[in-house]
UniProtKB/Swiss-Prot annotation:
HAMAP family: GlmM_B. Gene3D superfamilies: Alpha-D-Glucose-1,6-Bisphosphate, subunit A, domain 3, Alpha-D-phosphohexomutase, C-terminal domain. It comes from the Bacteria. Disulfide bonds: none annotated. Its cofactor is Mg(2+). Mg(2+) binds at residues 100, 239, 241, 243. Its EC number is 5.4.2.10. Catalyzes the conversion of glucosamine-6-phosphate to glucosamine-1-phosphate. Coiled coil: none annotated. This is Phosphoglucosamine mutase. Binds 1 Mg(2+) ion per subunit. One of its GO terms (cellular component) is cytosol.
């Protein structure tokens, strides 16, 4: 039974629950104990731009050093950059200090293995077992050393650009890039600018507090307005740690993760390089399923979370998968979700077909989908309550085969997520609120 690790590492409000300096120190030590048994005894640490990153970086650094591991600091860098540099430095592990799309007062810690993928469940459980033991520092001559990777940003920028076909250029394209005041603020604009685009940046002035605040992939209003006002060809919105992407076409319409998956799958199929099909999640829009089916592209759903998308991709030996929230995996171009690289792959498809973003999405019709988050911090499971089950069954009967209902607990926040999908937007919204009220009545 997991006590500390959730579906995406450890995450919570800073100074409360799990996210304390004491736990970070002990976690660094416990992870160091497990990781030092094999390999290079070298660990990379990256973080996003939230103010508490300094605190947790220092605590993790001290804990790892106390266990005898050498630490290499990257400073503010996107999560996928940590995965990439963990591989290229042959480090034993990479550590990301980030709460992704959450507000600044939250933070989290997650690990990558030496190949840039997320740690196996068994390794996380082994770390949890070490956490229960008293901290014992190694002898002084065995303590780890700490250094800084001075050219981390430049290395990752070149890696990102390497995913764009050399025979094409972004010359003539005007792109709005929203960095969410997060870890991509000094990376993403340079990548697209160096590939030839005219880049207008927003969300590129982090102050430790403003990460994800009214900007980024979870708040699309500002980028939509900017794309229209600047008469840009498209917009690319990243989240606080750069592992997810949402896009905006020139008319200000949001292009979400499902539509991005459709673009990438069609492009790969047209080039004859699509291996198998596409993995989505239980939250993926039914429209994606139908659009892929029309092109004879297999589609499978995993549980929600990029960890589970990756598991199903490996099980089926497919390459492309992701979530409608914008986590996009393409295993021919990396080992984890990468917002910048996903954007580059969409732009490459546009260049190959000499098509606009809206033209690339003409073949997919998204069904109205409403997601309602209900805060629930009780100890019992509201999804098993008779009143909630009854409300769900009632809605499902009304939707028939042209809709879906999905209720699930968030893996990272004290929320119950209510998703309803169907043909008529107003009905879908009413159905979602009806079920949400049944859950709220239990609080």
């Amino acid at each position: 039974m997991r006590k500390f690790f959730g579906t995406d590492g450890i995450r919570g409000k800073v100074g409360a629950g799990k996210m304390t300096p004491e736990l970070a120190l002990k976690l660094g030590w416990a992870a160091g104990r497990v990781l030092s048994r094999t390999g290079t005894k070298k660990v990379i640490i990256g973080k996003d731009t939230r103010i508490s990153g300094y605190l947790f970086e220092s605590a993790m650094e001290a804990g790892l050093s106390a266990a005898g591991l050498n630490v290499m600091l990257m400073g503010p860098m996107p999560t996928p950059a940590v995965a990439y540099l963990t591989r290229t430095f042959r480090a034993e592990a990479g550590v990301v200090i980030s709460a992704s799309h959450n507000p600044y007062y939250d933070n989290g810690i997650k690990f990558f293995s030496t190949d840039g993928s997320k740690l196996d469940d068994e390794v996380e459980l082994e770390i949890e077992r070490e956490l229960e033991k008293p901290l014992e520092c190694v002898e002084s001559h065995l303590l780890g050393k700490v250094s800084r990777i001075e050219d981390a940003a430049g290395r990752y920028i070149e890696y990102c650009k390497g995913n764009f076909p050399a025979e094409h250029t972004l010359n003539g394209l005007k792109i709005v890039v929203d960095c969410a005041h997060g870890a991509t603020y000094h990376i993403a604009p340079s990548v697209f600018r160096e590939l030839g685009a005219e880049v207008i940046t927003i969300g590129d002035k982090p102050d430790g507090i403003n990460i994800n605040h009214e900007v980024g992939a979870t708040s699309m209003g500002k980028i939509r307005e900017t794309v229209i006002a600047e008469k840009a060809d498209l917009g690319i919105a990243l989240d606080g740690d750069g592992d997810r992407i949402m896009m905006v076409n020139r008319h200000g319409k949001v292009i979400d993760g499902d539509e991005i998956l459709y673009i990438l799958a069609c492009d790969a199929q047209d080039r004859g390089v699509l291996k198998g099909g596409v993995v989505g999640t239980l939250m993926s829009n039914l429209g994606l399923d139908l659009a892929l089916k029309a092109r004879d592209i297999p589609f499978a759903r995993s549980k929600v979370g990029d960890r589970y998308v990756m598991e199903l991709l490996k099980e089926k030996d497919w390459r492309i998968g992701g979530e409608n929230s914008g986590h996009i995996l393409n295993l021919d171009h990396g080992t984890t979700g990468d917002g910048i690289v996903a954007g580059i792959l969409v732009l490459a498809a546009m260049c190959r077909k000499q098509a606009t973003l809206e033209e690339l999405t003409e073949g997919i019709k998204m069904l109205p989908q409403v997601l309602v988050n209900v805060r629930f911090e009780g100890t019992h499971n509201p999804l098993e309550a008779d009143s909630v089950l009854s409300a769900q069954a009632e809605v499902e009967a009304k939707l028939g085969e042209r809709g879906r209902v999905l209720l699930r607990k968030s893996g990272t926040e004290p929320l119950i997520r209510v998703m309803v999908e169907g043909d008529v937007a107003s009905d879908v919204k009413a159905h979602a609120n009806y079920i949400a009220e049944a859950i709220k009545a239990l609080v």
